[in-house]
């Protein structure tokens, strides 16, 4: 069956960040698209306005008359639409397989990694847009100042974020693959086996054609080992001075950072200015720089992009300046939900605001991750002045480990840290009004529905 022979494509979980861009591409190419999700959101509303038939709630009737059903990694095998598609012998594929089909005919770039892939993909997309290459891109977050998470361009490049959480990125067939880092996340899928995680990343990179390029950060031991093992053409980057491209002379300012990228083979130095803060974002920019260079984009265009990049939604995003009982505070929102990401957030905020206290409102994400990385989370949260811990966001998991947010609070209090549990917005506000003394930073941190809390705090205190 050819893709051109397909009439109706149905998406289970169509409102998810990884699904909406693919669905939009298919609509723009003339396919009849339908999809279901548990709740209406901005993505489902947008797709409906473009012509997709949207169902709220999952029902076996929704997949009838479909030629193909696409599901995301968040969809459980017990989903009634999954079951119906199987019983009706409808072709059932993961989102990455559909994305792989769409990548054919493009010069494609895929960005993978445990952390930083959304920002890196966004930086690459912004550079290619400014270079007037009119790329198509599908990103797991929204570039601030831009309406959509996906754009269907007319150029030859397709830039995508690759999902390693369930190894579905192995379906992809890019010509340039980026790995920002490899860390101990999604180990529930990888059977708590880090070697299996490493080998899956290696397989992703080995899938490159012989004329392709792998771009890999070697600052972590795991990604460095994968780089050394890889047989495909490869380029390394990082703060490590042995990397093919390394960063030096990083200077953090209040609203931007400056650094140099050195090409090891020639010693050539490029001075860059980036609107994003934090060492982790300098690394993300280095990856984007190398990809843009591989595409032959002028250095001036790259510099212009970095200097004017608007940022990515929920990645150290400035929300508002607040007044809480007359005391000033700055509200920041961040998607990070792994200890490495929390550490990067805290370090970035401290480097730009060395004299301000930090209050982190943290919503742990998944019982499995909270249990496995509990000690690492506590080590990170010790570095903020006040922690407000919300209920763990289950993301559909059962609490087999019997872990509670009180475990976080009690562990922090044992370490003489200022920590609280909050059940709801009212309790959060009560704590903020008691604890915020003025000239502080409040960070809403997590991958669940904490963005709603952030928006509510903004509405109350702005």
Please place each PLM-identified region on the residue numbering.
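Phosphate-binding loop of NTP-binding sites
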Residues: 2, 25-31, 48, 61-64, ...
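Nucleotide phosphate-binding/pyrophosphate-handling subdomain across enzymes
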Residues: 2-10, 18, 22-29, 176, ...
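Conserved N-terminal Rossmann-fold NAD(P)-binding element of oxidoreductases
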Residues: 9-14, 445
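NAD(P)-binding Rossmann-fold cofactor-contacting core
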Residues: 32-46
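Conserved beta-strand positions in the Rossmann-like core of class I SAM-dependent methyltransferases
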Residues: 34-35, 136, 388
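Beta-strand->loop->alpha-helix junctions that form or flank phosphate-binding loops
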Residues: 36-37, 55-58, 93-97, 138-139, ...
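C-terminal helical cap/extension that packs against the catalytic core
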Residues: 59, 378-438
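P-loop/Walker A phosphate-binding loop and immediately adjacent motor/lid segment at beta-alpha junctions
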Residues: 81-91, 207-212, 232, 344-353, ...
């Amino acid at each position: 069956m050819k893709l051109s022979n397909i009439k109706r494509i149905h998406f289970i979980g169509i409102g998810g960040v990884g699904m909406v861009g693919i669905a939009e591409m298919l609509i723009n190419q003339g396919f009849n698209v339908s999809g279901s999700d548990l709740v209406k959101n901005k993505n489902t509303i947008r797709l409906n306005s473009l012509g997709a038939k949207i169902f709220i709630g999952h029902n076996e009737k929704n997949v009838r008359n479909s030629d193909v059903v696409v599901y995301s990694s968040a969809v459980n095998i017990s989903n009634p639409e999954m079951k119906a598609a199987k019983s009706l012998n409808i072709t059932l594929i993961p989102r990455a397989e559909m994305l792989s089909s769409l990548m054919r005919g493009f010069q494609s770039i895929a960005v993978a990694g445990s952390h930083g892939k959304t920002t890196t993909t966004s930086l690459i997309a912004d550079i290619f847009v400014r270079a007037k290459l009119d790329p198509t891109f599908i990103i797991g977050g929204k570039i601030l100042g831009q309406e959509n998470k996906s754009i269907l361009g007319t150029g030859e490049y397709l830039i995508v974020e690759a999902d390693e959480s369930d190894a579905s990125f192995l379906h992809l067939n890019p010509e340039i693959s980026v790995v920002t880092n490899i860390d101990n996340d999604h180990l529930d899928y990888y059977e708590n086996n880090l070697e299996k995680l490493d080998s899956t990343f290696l397989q992703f990179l080995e899938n490159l054609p012989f004329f392709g390029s792998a771009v890999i950060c070697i600052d972590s031991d795991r990604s460095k080992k994968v780089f050394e093992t890889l047989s495909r053409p490869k380029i390394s980057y990082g703060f490590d001075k042995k990397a093919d491209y390394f960063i030096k002379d990083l200077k953090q300012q209040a609203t931007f950072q400056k650094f140099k990228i050195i090409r090891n083979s020639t010693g050539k130095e490029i001075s860059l200015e980036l609107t994003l803060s934090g060492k982790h974002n300098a690394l993300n920019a280095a990856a984007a720089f190398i990809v843009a260079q591989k595409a032959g984009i002028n250095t001036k265009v790259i510099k212009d992009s970095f200097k004017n990049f608007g940022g990515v939604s929920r990645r150290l995003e400035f929300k508002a300046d607040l007044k809480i009982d007359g005391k000033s505070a700055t509200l920041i929102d961040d998607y990070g939900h792994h200890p490495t990401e929390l550490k990067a957030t805290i370090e970035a905020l401290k480097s730009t605001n060395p004299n301000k206290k930090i209050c982190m409102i943290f919503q742990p994400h998944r019982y499995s991750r909270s249990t496995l990385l509990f000690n690492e989370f506590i080590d990170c949260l010790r570095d903020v002045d006040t922690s407000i811990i919300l209920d763990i966001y289950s993301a559909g998991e059962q609490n087999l480990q019997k872990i509670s947010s009180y475990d976080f609070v009690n562990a922090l209090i044992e370490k003489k840290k200022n920590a609280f549990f909050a059940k709801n917005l009212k309790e959060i506000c009560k704590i903020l009004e008691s604890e915020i003394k003025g000239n502080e930073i409040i960070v809403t941190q997590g991958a669940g529905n904490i963005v709603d809390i952030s928006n509510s705090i903004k509405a109350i205190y702005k």
